[in-house]
C-alpha cells in the first residue's frame, strides 16, 4: 500500500519561515558586532604577519601601538611616493602599515607590493587622526603620536625611505609578465643595425603641466634645448646608446626630438590611465633622462644608473618652492641641467 504523504500545513510553514528569518538576523547581527572595531586579538594577529611588525621593538615587547595608513591620491608616481613613505614611517615609528583599497588597485597590478589592505568598510569605523606630511623628511616624523594615524599630503622624497632602498626596490619589483614584456621590446631594438648595449629611458612630462607650470607655479616644462643637451651628454659618455622615449605628449616629442642619428625610439603609448607599459620600459633601461614629475623620479630611482633631470625650472619667487625642495626630490648623485626660464621673463 502506498504511503500517504502528510500535507505541509500553512501554520507550520509560517513557523519555519519565522525561525529561518530570526536565525539569519541574529547571525548577521553577530557578524556586525564582530566587525564594529578592530579588537586587540585581531590586530595582534595582523601584526604577526605585517612586513613592518617583525622588525620593530613594539612587537618584541608585545605592545600594541595602533596603525598607520595614508591617503591614496594622484597618479602612479604619487601613489608610489605615498606607499614608500608609509612603509618607511611605519617602520620608523614601530607601527603597522595598511594601505587603502584604491592604492592597492593602483599598484598591485604592476608591482609585488606586500603591505596589507585596509578595506573601506573597516577604515570608516576607525577614529583616524589626520597627520599632514610635507614633501621632505623632518625630525618630528620620527616620533608621530596617535594610535590610528592617517597621513595626508603628497610625499615623494627619497629623504623618507632611501635608508630602506633595498626593501623599497623589492616592494616595487615588477610582476614577471610586466617586466618580460618590457625586456622583449628592448631586446628587439637596433641602432643603425646593431643591438645596443646601453639603454637610456627618456620620460617627457607634458599634459596638464604645460599650462599649470607657467600659470600656477611660475615654472616651465622641458623644452627642445634641454632634451638635446641631455641626449648629447649620454652620447658622449656611452658608445651607441639607444634612447627609449615615453611621454604623455608623444606628438610634441616626435616634433622636437632629433632622430637623425637613428638612436631614438618612440616607445610609450602615452596613456596616463594605464601607465604600466611606459613605466616598465623606463625601469628596465640602464639610465634615465627625466624632465619633471614623480613618474620620472620613480622611474629613475628604480632603474638606477645615471640620471639627468631638469633643474631650476621655476622662478625664485615661485610658490611651488614652498611645497617642493629640489634637494629632497633628486638624489645627490643625479645630474641637473638648468631650465631655460626666458619664456617666463617675457610676461
From Swiss-Prot:
It catalyses: a beta-D-galactosyl-(1->3)-N-acetyl-beta-D-glucosaminyl derivative + GDP-beta-L-fucose = an alpha-L-Fuc-(1->2)-beta-D-Gal-(1->3)-beta-D-GlcNAc derivative + GDP + H(+); a beta-D-galactosyl-(1->4)-N-acetyl-beta-D-glucosaminyl derivative + GDP-beta-L-fucose = an alpha-L-Fuc-(1->2)-beta-D-Gal-(1->4)-beta-D-GlcNAc derivative + GDP + H(+); a neolactoside nLc4Cer + GDP-beta-L-fucose = a neolactoside IV(2)-alpha-Fuc-nLc4Cer + GDP + H(+); a neolactoside nLc4Cer(d18:1(4E)) + GDP-beta-L-fucose = a neolactoside IV(2)-alpha-Fuc-nLc4Cer(d18:1(4E)) + GDP + H(+). Its main location: Golgi. The keyword Transport does not apply. GO terms for biological process: fucosylation; glycolipid metabolic process; oligosaccharide biosynthetic process; protein glycosylation; regulation of cell adhesion; regulation of endothelial cell proliferation. It is found in: Golgi apparatus, Golgi stack membrane. It is an enzyme of class 2 (transferase). One of its GO terms (cellular component) is Golgi cisterna membrane. Glycans are attached at residues 192, 258, 286, 312. One of its GO terms (molecular function) is fucosyltransferase activity. The keyword Cell membrane does not apply. Its EC number is 2.4.1.69, 2.4.1.344. Residues 27-347 are lumenal. Disruption phenotype: Homozygous knockout mice for FUT2 are fertiles and develop normally and exhibit no gross phenotypic abnormalities. Pathway: Protein modification; protein glycosylation. CDD domains: Fut1_Fut2_like (cd11301). Residues 1-5 are cytoplasmic. Induction: Induced after microbes administration in the intestinal epithelia, particularly in the duodenal and jejunal epithelia. Down-regulated by androgen in the caput epididymis. Keywords: Glycoprotein, Glycosyltransferase, Golgi apparatus, Lipid metabolism, Membrane, Signal-anchor, Transferase, Transmembrane, Transmembrane helix. It is a single-pass type II membrane protein. Expressed in stomach, colon, ovary and uterus, specifically in luminal uterine epithelium. Expressed in various tissues including heart, liver, kidney, testis, epididymis, small intestine,and cecum. Expressed in duodenum, jejunum and ileum. Catalyzes the transfer of L-fucose, from a guanosine diphosphate-beta-L-fucose, to the terminal galactose on both O- and N-linked glycans chains of cell surface glycoproteins and glycolipids and the resulting epitope regulates several processes such as cell-cell interaction including host-microbe interaction, cell surface expression and cell proliferation. Preferentially fucosylates gangliosides GA1 and GM1 in the antrum, cecum and colon and in the female reproductive organs. In mouse, there are three genes (Fut1, Fut2 and Sec1) which encode galactoside 2-L-fucosyltransferase. This is Galactoside alpha-(1,2)-fucosyltransferase 2. The lineage of its organism: Eukaryota, Metazoa, Chordata, Craniata, Vertebrata. The gene is Fut2.
